[in-house]
UniProtKB/Swiss-Prot annotation:
Pfam families: NDK. This is Nucleoside diphosphate kinase. Homotetramer. The active site is at H117 (pros-phosphohistidine intermediate). NCBIfam families: PRK00668.1. It comes from Anaeromyxobacter dehalogenans (strain 2CP-C). It is found in: Cytoplasm.
Amino acid sequence: MAIERTLSIIKPDGVEKGIIGKIIGRFEEKGLKPVAIRLTQLSKAEAEGFYAVHKARPFFADLVKFMTSGPVVLMVLEGENAVARNREIMGATDPKKADAGTIRKDFATDIEKNTVHGSDSVENAKIEVSYFFPEVQVHAYEWKKLA
Ligand code: GDP
Ligand code: MG
């Protein structure tokens, strides 16, 4: 199994709901280690650039508006198969279709305000991590977890 890094975002609805800690806790419990974290508010240009692949989609303008509507938490998560593992922990894009026990099933409001972002491939993860975090802001460490 490969150790990977992936980009995770706690979206404005997750920050507003006061569940930053709960979400990070789920990642830690499930073997994904935060190796970079920053709370920030995205500019329109940052959100448009980040979601450029969705530019032609009908929901693009609304998505950019939502993603810039309040603070977000940007994170790099590290672990075995981190990209796919993060997507499993998040659940499906539409919370109505998300499996029980996933973040989106438990916390999301709707298909847009769905609480978390996660990179969808190893290749995109590299691009997305470097979009927000220069390498010097990512700090690897070993876990010595309590039993
Ligand atoms: P993800 O990879 O599971 O986050 O989903 P996508 O990459 O397909 O879409 C990016 C984000 O756009 C989603 O997480 C939602 O916030 C939003 N989104 C996706 N589909 C829709 C839609 O049909 N309507 C609206 N309003 N937003 C959507
Ligand atoms: Mg996506």
